[in-house]
Amino acid sequence: NGVDLTGWQGWVADPYTLKKLSAQEKKMRQEEADEKMRQHWQAKDGKIVFSGEGANLVTKRTFEDFEMHVDWKITKDGDSGIYLRGYPQVQIWDTSRVEVGAQVGSGGLYNNQKGFSTPLTVADRPVGTWNHFFIRMLGDRVTVYLNDVLVVNDVALENYWDRNLPV
């Protein structure tokens, strides 16, 4: 909503771990995660801002097939990403970090091992400037545009938490 973090909560655990927790344990862990969220995330000037430390932020809503728009910018040496349905991730990073392979650009499905993981092209704007993702997820298939350039075209997102199961 651009004013506060209504609709958001702290990341507790991957989907498989969450299912195994008792209601009481899940509630306790959620309270801890929400406290960490409040320490490191804030709504400011219509944007969600992260301190660069702490845990992930997740929506309270559940989505099936979806399209989303995300405006983002990253700092020098930054490394981040967007989890889709709790699975990592559409990669965001400083492309000058060649020692970790970041020269391939942002937008790839970084944790894919069997299939396509790198972007089709580098479409990142310079560090410290705004970039825009359009992400579509239909079933386990992901398409990503970065700054209106197609970087991932209908690729299956692999299940990072259990490589033998689909998303």
Predicted regions and their residues:
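Carbohydrate-interacting regions of secretory-pathway proteins
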Residues: 1-167
